[in-house]
């Protein structure tokens, strides 16, 4: 299936860089979603085990989620640059 997509892209004159940019953007979004899901799940588990530490756990969860989201945004920007330049 992937070979047929690559052959169609090559035949249509679309560069493989555009296909790679789309694939990279998709993988970046999927990775960020998985990462933020794991962060949230682990934070909820930690709060369930130690409710008195919920403030610290929540703060660390928000910082980690922001870092994961920042990396995903950077990956999307790089993919868009490859796509349009």
Curated annotation (Swiss-Prot):
The domain of life is Bacteria
Cite the entry's keywords alphabetically: ATP synthesis, Cell inner membrane, Cell membrane, CF(0), Hydrogen ion transport, Ion transport, Lipid-binding, Membrane, Transmembrane, Transmembrane helix, Transport
Annotated Pfam families? ATP-synt_C
Q: Which chain positions lie within coiled-coil regions?
A: none
Q: Which residues cross the membrane?
A: 19-39, 62-82
Which gene name does the record give?
atpE
Family the UniProt entry places it in? Belongs to the ATPase C chain family.
How is the protein disposed in the membrane?
A: Multi-pass membrane protein
According to the record's subunit comment, the protein's assembly and interactions are: F-type ATPases have 2 components, F(1) - the catalytic core - and F(0) - the membrane proton channel. F(1) has five subunits: alpha(3), beta(3), gamma(1), delta(1), epsilon(1). F(0) has three main subunits: a(1), b(2) and c(10-14). The alpha and beta chains form an alternating ring which encloses part of the gamma chain. F(1) is attached to F(0) by a central stalk formed by the gamma and epsilon chains, while a peripheral stalk is formed by the delta and b chains.
Quote one Gene Ontology molecular function term. proton-transporting ATP synthase activity, rotational mechanism
Locate the site labelled Reversibly protonated during proton transport.
69
Its recorded name reads: ATP synthase subunit c
Q: What does this protein do?
A: F(1)F(0) ATP synthase produces ATP from ADP in the presence of a proton or sodium gradient. F-type ATPases consist of two structural domains, F(1) containing the extramembraneous catalytic core and F(0) containing the membrane proton channel, linked together by a central stalk and a peripheral stalk. During catalysis, ATP synthesis in the catalytic domain of F(1) is coupled via a rotary mechanism of the central stalk subunits to proton translocation.
Extract the InterPro entries matched here.
Answer: ATP_synth_csu_bac/chlpt (IPR005953), ATP_synth_F0_csu (IPR000454), ATP_synth_F0_csu_DDCD_BS (IPR020537), ATP_synth_F0_csu_sf (IPR038662), ATPase_proteolipid_c-like_dom (IPR002379), F/V-ATP_Csub_sf (IPR035921)
GO CC, alphabetical: plasma membrane; proton-transporting ATP synthase complex; proton-transporting two-sector ATPase complex, proton-transporting domain
Q: Give the location in the cell.
A: Cell inner membrane
PANTHER family in alphabetical order? ATP SYNTHASE LIPID-BINDING PROTEIN, MITOCHONDRIAL (PTHR10031), ATPASE PROTEIN 9 (PTHR10031:SF0)
Q: What is the lineage of its organism?
A: Bacteria, Pseudomonadati, Bacteroidota, Bacteroidia, Bacteroidales
